[in-house]
């Protein structure tokens, strides 16, 4: 993305600061706060006027108009304003205010991926109904001219569409890309200058485009999960993604009439769901029948790192496919080592001198020089040479110094190949150590880095190390992430003005139409695409029914490659075709979530304002008893446990059907009983309840045990993971 020059940036900041201070000289230093006020009143009401009057009472008439940043007025009630901490606390004490929290900034977290999850081009589709489904993508914008968003063969937008094309300068929508908006006052367009939003939008709902590739790698037909669906793009990310803009995008997307929201943005840890923009936005989306898919985050493999943990949204971990990118390093002595990267460059059989970072630095300590830290690589000493760096981020410094190539030790992301701007490879510890030994002993040491090739990864699927893990420390007794989806080395549409190796080097000037990216950001739109696919078959299904269908039909993964098991992959890897016909679903209504929030400590007044419903909190639902498709409980590591889960399923399969329960796999540490063990249905939409009781001896501190309940009628298999854990923050 193009950046403001430093002088202009400072001028803009100076202007903002001057404006705020001059508006009210006695005010303390201020920040942007979000004042969330719940649902919009049903009476005749002007949100901006009301918001301004609140500020006028707080700071006076003259200052108020300068402090108001944005009003949320289409789908829920609230505003953003420049406030001091003391002023924010005064607003928090107002009866009509649910929460006040600072607007933070957050990070943005295919030819083969859909085939790998059993969702080929010939999968059963309802193309006419699919074209009525609208996927809203909250991200870094979109490149409207991409073939993935061409509207050939599309009719006019669905009648339910209430949005518009406000993409800015030189930006045109069409019958495929039916809407666009942007939310930063320094921007002039919804056009994607980072590539991220274009990539995610095309993964969810892009057209089928033949012969797509990244310089010949991953060649094939690139397509989204629902190629016939429509797309609306909401640009909230401009290097970073601010809460104030994220909420504005939700406000618009809900009112515009989207059916599914994909948001590949991982919010920082929050202790209160009503202080989190994605949680608030997705709650109001759920109330309007819209399902939100959100990325689990890229802070793995640490326990408890999972983000976007609201129970009303579907939280997506990343998994790999059976396609892996590797490259080989051939040393002067003929020894070949295997590394990983997406390296499209060819050295044509020529071996170049290879030097260690410590030997080509004049200004740094030995440790920093070995890492190839910023400013440590001497350009005069690396010209025409390959540099060996102890740190993954040495890529950029070697490139900027003018080296012919780089080899790095990859302990940061050992299972993820990233696009590199010149010949490069990342090696595991043992192979890297052998190169260091070779440099010390050979005279002269030489090497060649070969172009990346594709191989079959027979251990897939597995969750890569970067994908955030559970358990959730925000809401105990709720399994997060919910599911996993392909998010490793995914090819999809890209912005031609963005650097394809921006993660490592924004100076990479290559222009591409399709690129390879990794992250839970890439996994999230896969699930949004599946949700849209299920919606095309069942347009009247609730968000919880669609979510249940995706979760209970997911495939459990290889335990040897995924030692964290459900805390890594949730219910398992998505199976789109099965999700369209799940047999049974677990449904959760708004009032059920509110009862759960009561049990989590929220009071009746707060929840009444939030939902617009009359909430008394006389009835509370423990999180473990929320009618969720998984069953999870925290247990003390000091005592044996005995826990009961109550669940209700709705028949959406055959009218006359009988389901029998089984426990898979049987675990000696976990005793499970199900009552009743048989459910008989006589008609569609009939509901049946059952109780699952688990017991066991005390778990070791920081451990867990898991199994699953599977209901089967011979045609459908409805699987619900069960997890007991003693992991604490």
Curated annotation (Swiss-Prot):
<keyword id="KW-0378">Hydrolase</keyword>
<comment type="similarity">
    <text>Belongs to the peptidase S8 family.</text>
</comment>
<dbReference type="InterPro" id="IPR045051">
    <property type="entry name" value="SBT"/>
</dbReference>
<keyword id="KW-0645">Protease</keyword>
<feature type="glycosylation site" description="N-linked (GlcNAc...) asparagine">
    <location>
        <position position="359"/>
    </location>
</feature>
<dbReference type="InterPro" id="IPR034197">
    <property type="entry name" value="Peptidases_S8_3"/>
</dbReference>
<dbReference type="GO" id="GO:0006508">
    <property type="term" value="P:proteolysis"/>
</dbReference>
<dbReference type="GO" id="GO:0046686">
    <property type="term" value="P:response to cadmium ion"/>
</dbReference>
<feature type="active site" description="Charge relay system">
    <location>
        <position position="196"/>
    </location>
</feature>
<dbReference type="InterPro" id="IPR023828">
    <property type="entry name" value="Peptidase_S8_Ser-AS"/>
</dbReference>
<keyword id="KW-0720">Serine protease</keyword>
<dbReference type="Pfam" id="PF05922">
    <property type="entry name" value="Inhibitor_I9"/>
</dbReference>
<dbReference type="InterPro" id="IPR041469">
    <property type="entry name" value="Subtilisin-like_FN3"/>
</dbReference>
<dbReference type="InterPro" id="IPR037045">
    <property type="entry name" value="S8pro/Inhibitor_I9_sf"/>
</dbReference>
<feature type="domain" description="Peptidase S8">
    <location>
        <begin position="113"/>
        <end position="580"/>
    </location>
</feature>
<feature type="active site" description="Charge relay system">
    <location>
        <position position="521"/>
    </location>
</feature>
<keyword id="KW-0068">Autocatalytic cleavage</keyword>
<dbReference type="InterPro" id="IPR015500">
    <property type="entry name" value="Peptidase_S8_subtilisin-rel"/>
</dbReference>
<dbReference type="GO" id="GO:0005576">
    <property type="term" value="C:extracellular region"/>
</dbReference>
<dbReference type="GO" id="GO:0004252">
    <property type="term" value="F:serine-type endopeptidase activity"/>
</dbReference>
<feature type="domain" description="PA">
    <location>
        <begin position="350"/>
        <end position="436"/>
    </location>
</feature>
<feature type="glycosylation site" description="N-linked (GlcNAc...) asparagine">
    <location>
        <position position="275"/>
    </location>
</feature>
<feature type="active site" description="Charge relay system">
    <location>
        <position position="139"/>
    </location>
</feature>
<feature type="signal peptide">
    <location>
        <begin position="1"/>
        <end position="23"/>
    </location>
</feature>
<dbReference type="Pfam" id="PF00082">
    <property type="entry name" value="Peptidase_S8"/>
</dbReference>
<keyword id="KW-0325">Glycoprotein</keyword>
<feature type="glycosylation site" description="N-linked (GlcNAc...) asparagine">
    <location>
        <position position="363"/>
    </location>
</feature>
<dbReference type="Pfam" id="PF17766">
    <property type="entry name" value="fn3_6"/>
</dbReference>
<dbReference type="InterPro" id="IPR036852">
    <property type="entry name" value="Peptidase_S8/S53_dom_sf"/>
</dbReference>
<dbReference type="InterPro" id="IPR010259">
    <property type="entry name" value="S8pro/Inhibitor_I9"/>
</dbReference>
<feature type="glycosylation site" description="N-linked (GlcNAc...) asparagine">
    <location>
        <position position="82"/>
    </location>
</feature>
<feature type="glycosylation site" description="N-linked (GlcNAc...) asparagine">
    <location>
        <position position="642"/>
    </location>
</feature>
<feature type="glycosylation site" description="N-linked (GlcNAc...) asparagine">
    <location>
        <position position="614"/>
    </location>
</feature>
<keyword id="KW-0865">Zymogen</keyword>
<protein>
    <recommendedName>
        <fullName>Subtilisin-like protease SBT4.3</fullName>
        <ecNumber>3.4.21.-</ecNumber>
    </recommendedName>
</protein>
<feature type="glycosylation site" description="N-linked (GlcNAc...) asparagine">
    <location>
        <position position="348"/>
    </location>
</feature>
<feature type="domain" description="Inhibitor I9">
    <location>
        <begin position="32"/>
        <end position="108"/>
    </location>
</feature>
<keyword id="KW-0964">Secreted</keyword>
<feature type="propeptide" description="Activation peptide">
    <location>
        <begin position="24"/>
        <end position="109"/>
    </location>
</feature>
<dbReference type="InterPro" id="IPR000209">
    <property type="entry name" value="Peptidase_S8/S53_dom"/>
</dbReference>
<keyword id="KW-0732">Signal</keyword>
<feature type="glycosylation site" description="N-linked (GlcNAc...) asparagine">
    <location>
        <position position="656"/>
    </location>
</feature>
């Amino acid at each position: 993305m193009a950046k403001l020059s430093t002088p202009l940036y400072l001028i803009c900041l100076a202007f903002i600061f001057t404006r705020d201070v001059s508006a009210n000289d006695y005010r303390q230093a201020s920040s942007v706060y979000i004042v969330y006020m719940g649902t919009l009143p049903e009476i005749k009401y002007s949100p901006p006027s009301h918001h301004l009057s609140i500020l006028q009472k707080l700071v006076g008439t003259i200052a108020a108009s300068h402090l108001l940043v944005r009003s949320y007025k289409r789908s829920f009630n609230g505003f953003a304003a420049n406030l001091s901490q003391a002023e924010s606390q005064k607003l928090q004490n107002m009866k009509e205010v649910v929460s006040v929290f600072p607007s933070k900034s957050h990070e943005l977290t295919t030819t083969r991926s859909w085939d790998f999850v059993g969702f080929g081009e010939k999968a059963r589709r309802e193309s006419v109904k699919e074209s009525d489904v609208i996927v809203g993508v909250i991200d870094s914008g979109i490149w409207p001219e991409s073939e993935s968003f061409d509207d050939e063969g599309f009719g006019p937008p669905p009648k339910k569409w209430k949005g518009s094309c406000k993409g800015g300068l030189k930006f045109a929508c069409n019958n495929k890309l039916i809407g666009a908006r942007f939310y930063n006052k320094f921007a002039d367009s919804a056009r994607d200058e980072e590539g991220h939003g274009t990539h995610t939008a095309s993964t969810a709902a892009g057209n089928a485009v033949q012969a797509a590739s990244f310089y010949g790698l991953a060649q094939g037909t690139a397509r989204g999960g629902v190629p016939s669906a429509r797309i609306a793009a909401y640009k909230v990310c401009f290097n970073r993604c601010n809460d104030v803009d994220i909420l504005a995008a939700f406000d618009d997307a809900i009112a515009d009439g989207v059916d599914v929201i994909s948001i590949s943005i991982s919010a920082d840890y929050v202790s209160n769901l009503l202080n989190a923009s994605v949680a608030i936005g997705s709650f109001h989306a759920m109330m309007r029948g819209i399902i939100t898919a959100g990325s689990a985050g890229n802070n793995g493999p640490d326990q408890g790192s999972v983000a976007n943990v609201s129970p009303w949204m579907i939280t997506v971990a990343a998994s790999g496919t059976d396609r892996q990118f590797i490259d080989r390093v051939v040393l002067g002595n003929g020894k070949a080592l295997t590394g990983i990267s997406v390296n499209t460059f060819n050295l044509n059989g020529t071996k170049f001198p290879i030097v260690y970072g410590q030997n080509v630095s004049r200004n740094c300590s030995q440790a920093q020089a070995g890492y190839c830290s910023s400013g440590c690589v001497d350009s005069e000493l690396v010209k025409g040479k390959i540099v060996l760096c102890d740190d993954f981020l040495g890529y950029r410094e070697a490139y900027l110094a003018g080296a012919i190539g780089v080899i790095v030790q990859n302990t940061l992301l050992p299972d993820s190949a990233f696009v590199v701007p010149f010949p490069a490879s990342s090696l595991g510890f043992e192979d890297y150590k052998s190169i260091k030994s070779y440099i010390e002993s050979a005279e002269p040491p030489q090497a060649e880095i070969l172009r990346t090739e594709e191989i079959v990864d027979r251990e897939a699927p597995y969750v890569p190390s970067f994908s955030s893990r559970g358990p959730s420390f925000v809401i105990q007794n709720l399994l997060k992430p919910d599911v996993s989806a392909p998010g490793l080395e995914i090819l999809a549409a890209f912005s031609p003005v963005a650097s394809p190796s921006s993660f490592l080097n924004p100076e990479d000037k290559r222009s591409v139409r399709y690129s390879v990216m990794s992250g839970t950001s890439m996994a999230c739109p896969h699930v949004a695409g599946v949700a849209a696919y299920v919606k095309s078959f069942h347009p009247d299904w609730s968000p919880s029914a669609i979510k249940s269908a995706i979760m209970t039909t997911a495939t459990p993964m290889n335990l040897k490659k995924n030692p964290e098991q459900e805390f890594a992959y949730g219910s398992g890897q998505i199976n789109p075709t099965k999700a369209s016909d799940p047999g049974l679903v677990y449904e959760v209504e708004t009032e059920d979530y509110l009862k759960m929030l009561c049990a989590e400590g929220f009071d009746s007044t707060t929840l009444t304002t939030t939902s617009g419903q009359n909430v008394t909190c006389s009835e509370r639902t423990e999180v473990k008893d929320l009618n969720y498709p998984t069953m999870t409980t925290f247990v003390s590591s000091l005592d044996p446990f005995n826990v009961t889960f109550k669940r209700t399923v709705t028949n959406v399969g055959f009218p006359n059907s009988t389901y029998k329960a089984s426990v898979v796999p049987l675990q000696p540490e976990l005793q499970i009983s199900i009552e009743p063990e048989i459910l008989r249905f006589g008609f569609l939409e009939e509901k049946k309840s059952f109780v699952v009781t688990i017991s066991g001896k005390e778990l070791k501190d920081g451990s867990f045990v898991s199994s699953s309940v599977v209901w089967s009628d011979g045609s459908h298999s409805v699987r619900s993971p069960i997890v007991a854990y003693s992991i604490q923050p």
